[in-house]
């Protein structure tokens, strides 16, 4: 299991809010995580989680976010089975032990 390192920041208050969460990585993105389906990561919210993933799995953010840094429309992010679109988006707070699932949208016809 990959455990990304924390970015070095000068604001000590930032570190007080960091939580370790489990991130479930879909198969198409596992090439960025050395084949790992689950990663433990440290972040205070979903936006910081995406940045931490990018810092430790270079190139993954371009697959997760559009040019404006917003989650791509065809990917759904869930925190403990709750869609972040109905919470606070990338500002959705994370707590220790939370599970974040990244799920590609499925469509059919």
UniProtKB/Swiss-Prot annotation:
This is Putative sulfur carrier protein slr0821. Belongs to the sulfur carrier protein CysO family. Gene3D superfamilies: 3.10.20.30. It comes from Synechocystis sp. (strain ATCC 27184 / PCC 6803 / Kazusa). One of its GO terms (biological process) is Mo-molybdopterin cofactor biosynthetic process. Pfam families: ThiS. Disulfide bonds: none annotated. GO terms for cellular component: molybdopterin adenylyltransferase complex.
């Amino acid at each position: 299991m990959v455990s990304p390192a924390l970015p070095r920041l000068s604001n000590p208050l930032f570190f007080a809010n960091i939580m370790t969460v489990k991130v479930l990585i879909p198969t198409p993105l596992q090439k960025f995580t050395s084949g790992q389906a689950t990663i433990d990561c440290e972040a205070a919210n979903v936006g910081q989680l995406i940045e931490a993933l990018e810092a430790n799995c270079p190139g993954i953010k371009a697959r997760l976010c559009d040019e404006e840094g917003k989650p791509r429309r065809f990917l759904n992010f869930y925190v403990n089975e709750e869609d972040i679109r109905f919470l606070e988006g990338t500002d959705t707070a994370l707590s220790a032990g939370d599970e974040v699932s990244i799920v590609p949208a499925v469509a059919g016809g």
